[in-house]
């Protein structure tokens, strides 16, 4: 657990001592920025030599005393530098958790004769999963009390849980280290007893066959952490006797399991950056083997969903923005025989698909704006679902019944809290089942969200979403701005409501979400124009939006802050190398910053899967291009803005040593006196702390960092 409010250096920040001796004693306790030793490590490829003075910081065992001591010294220094904001952090934290409903419950869903729900008990960090038989007078059963399961552990997460078709056994997965490597356990719901079966080293998915005694799981490679082996496990047997059903030998592919909505098939997704396909087997046949629906091909993506003797398929075949087609069992393996259901459009990007008995429902994006449509199988006509706002996000919620007469969706906008609707398939009427309550009162009419387009340096219009409070927004340069973006992997982050942002917005901040190239906000081309040898567009777009905000007096650069995490942390590293003068402060969360070295090392998790995203630096053209923007390699002796960098020791996605090395190099080379803090969570991974409330400790720390630079970290 992070040490935010209990600081070893708290004595430094008491009232000034009255005597010279007392002052001297206090000053002796003041920590200076940790300076790391240098051990030159030579790396040579393509005739180019790089010297990495901090390569020694990598320790895959995470046990080296010197490395751990240096990380702790960084954390101690960060806490010291923020100690004077302790009370303000507490105020922010209490604000944030105060907006959360303490006894919150999820919308129940009916599955196989039971109603399922999760609940938060006041004061608890974790949910309790319960079910009730779908009949009058039935008593509630506790499936998993995650609070009890997490007792005594610094980190705990349930990855997945699933119940057998006979409703008697629950399988669930748990991670106690934050490396996203899960152990699957089983519990008899009739007796409450745990079964002896345990399956270690998995990606966490629990997929049952229909016989209620066998299940499928995905084993991870212990070094690369890639899921690559699919096994069938039979209850009552040891993991060592499990049957290997599939092994992925191409380490550029991700592998995932799923079960179709009609429960007829167990499937495998085979996914790389440029390919997607599926294998399936009959969930009713214990001897069944997986077979490909269609051969895997480079640059071909397809997902197949059964509908009786046919399949509905979302594909990019002859459709950059995707189309929906159908095929029979006989024609499924021949893409040239697939028949159009929803044709390709240059203007509309199809993002999601749900095949129900009565309607085919799909989500799409037109000029960056989300919508949802329902298609009638008989007529072939589709009708768009109407929502009140123009700037929103809609996606499928948990839909478990193929025969359902309604589709359950989640809806959110920058000013509307997350809401769950059931939409009637017959007349498209909407029933609001729940909207997340903002405790303490929230009036959406006091806030404005809008979408503007910003012209990039190469003439492209960049969508930008903006949120502010009406009575504090001036557009005269006096409002502070937090600008966020991600822009990688084709991941499209739509505008959303986050109650913690109110702690910024209500104090005058403007929140700006730049939908830069590298996502699929404006279709597949928007992604292609922000990857591989076009990656610089991602960074340029962010900087161009920043310059627009300054030019149009949304903000003065003395009040402009930037935030990005993971691949968005790479973005932060690139923009401060390109335009450090633009930003008062930058938050780089778990940042991917040592791009070239990581992508040259195939033993590091995720490397081989991402050659089609960044390029393979073993090819000179990619090496040269990646080197030109790699934040770690491009650190120079110059002024940088104030920086807050974060990591988790057990991060499985971006290893701790990347930001650790980056901070050390920045400390050594930067010429300014601006703040550089490295906030280290010694007990967490890529997603930060586990638990409902703990995450807000870090959020309060981050927000206090910005307010402190504005000299507003006081109440």
Predicted regions located by residue number:
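A flexible loop/linker signature enriched in serine peptidases of the S9 family
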Residues: 120-127, 150-155, 174-183, 198-203, ...
């Amino acid at each position: 657990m992070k040490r935010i409010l209990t600081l070893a250096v708290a004595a430094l920040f008491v009232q000034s001592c009255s005597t010279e001796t007392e002052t001297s004693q206090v000053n002796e306790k003041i920590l200076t920025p940790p300076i790391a030793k240098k051990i030159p490590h030579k790396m040579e490829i393509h005739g180019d030599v790089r010297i990495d003075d901090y390569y020694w910081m990598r320790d895959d065992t995470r046990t080296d005393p010197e490395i751990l001591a240096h990380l702790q010294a960084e954390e101690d220094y960060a806490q010291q530098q923020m100690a004077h904001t302790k009370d303000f952090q507490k105020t922010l934290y209490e604000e944030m958790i105060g907006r959360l409903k303490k006894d919150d419950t999820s919308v129940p869903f009916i599955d196989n004769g039971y109603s399922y729900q999760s609940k938060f008990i006041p004061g608890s960090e974790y949910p309790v999963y319960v079910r009730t038989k779908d009949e009058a007078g039935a008593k509630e059963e506790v499936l998993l009390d995650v609070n009890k399961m997490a007792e005594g552990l610094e980190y705990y997460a349930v990855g997945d849980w699933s119940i057998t078709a006979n409703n008697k056994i629950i399988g669930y997965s748990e991670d106690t280290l934050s490396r996203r490597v899960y152990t699957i356990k089983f519990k008899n719901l009739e007796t409450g007893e745990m079964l002896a079966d345990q399956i270690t080293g998995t990606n966490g998915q629990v997929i049952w066959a229909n016989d209620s005694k066998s299940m499928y799981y995905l084993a991870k490679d212990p070094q690369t952490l890639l899921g690559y082996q699919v096994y069938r496990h039979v209850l009552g047997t040891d993991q060592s006797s499990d049957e290997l059903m599939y092994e992925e030998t191409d380490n550029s592919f991700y592998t995932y399991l799923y079960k179709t909505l009609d429960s007829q098939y167990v499937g495998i997704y085979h996914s790389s950056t440029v390919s997607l396909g599926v294998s399936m087997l009959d969930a009713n046949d214990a001897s069944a083997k997986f077979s490909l629906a269609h051969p895997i091909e480079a640059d071909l993506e397809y997902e197949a969903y059964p509908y009786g003797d046919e399949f509905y398929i979302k594909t990019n075949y002859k459709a950059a923005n995707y189309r929906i087609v159908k095929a029979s069992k006989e024609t499924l393996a021949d893409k040239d025989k697939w028949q159009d259901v929803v044709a390709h459009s240059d203007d509309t990007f199809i993002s999601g698909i749900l095949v129900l008995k009565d309607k085919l429902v799909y989500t799409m994006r037109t000029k960056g704006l989300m919508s949802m449509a329902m298609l009638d199988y008989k007529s072939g006509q589709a009708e768009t679902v109407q929502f009140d706002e123009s700037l929103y996000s809609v996606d499928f919620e948990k839909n478990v019944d193929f025969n359902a007469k309604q589709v359950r969706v989640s809806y959110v906008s920058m000013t509307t809290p997350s809401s769950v609707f059931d939409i009637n398939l017959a007349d498209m009427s909407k029933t609001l089942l729940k909207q997340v309550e903002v405790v303490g009162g929230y009036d959406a009419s006091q806030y404005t969200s809008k979408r503007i387009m910003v012209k990039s340096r190469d003439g492209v219009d960049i969508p930008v979403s903006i949120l502010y409070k009406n009575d504090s927004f001036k557009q005269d340069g006096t409002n502070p701005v937090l600008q966020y973006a991600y822009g990688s992997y084709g991941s499209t982050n739509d505008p959303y409501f986050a109650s913690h942002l109110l702690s910024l917005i209500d104090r005058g901040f403007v929140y700006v979400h730049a939908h830069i190239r590298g996502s699929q906000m404006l279709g597949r081309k928007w992604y292609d124009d922000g990857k591989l040898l076009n990656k610089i567009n991602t960074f340029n777009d962010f900087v161009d939006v920043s310059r627009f905000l300054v030019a149009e007096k949304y903000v003065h650069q003395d009040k402009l802050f930037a935030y990005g995490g993971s691949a968005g942390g790479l973005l932060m590293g690139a923009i401060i190398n390109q335009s450090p003068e633009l930003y008062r402060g930058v938050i780089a969360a778990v940042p991917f910053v040592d791009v070239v070295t990581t992508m040259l090392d195939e033993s590091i998790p995720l490397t081989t899967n991402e050659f089609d995203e960044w390029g393979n630096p073993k090819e000179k053209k990619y090496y040269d291009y990646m080197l030109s923007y790699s934040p770690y390699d491009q650190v120079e002796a110059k002024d940088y803005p104030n920086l807050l960098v974060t990591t988790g020791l057990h991060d499985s996605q971006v290893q701790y040593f990347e930001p650790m090395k980056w901070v050390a190099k920045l400390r050594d080379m930067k010429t300014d006196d601006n703040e550089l803090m490295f906030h280290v969570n010694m007990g967490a991974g890529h997603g930060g702390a586990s638990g409902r409330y703990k995450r807000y400790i870090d959020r309060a720390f981050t927000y206090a960092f910005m307010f402190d630079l504005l000299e507003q970290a006081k109440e």
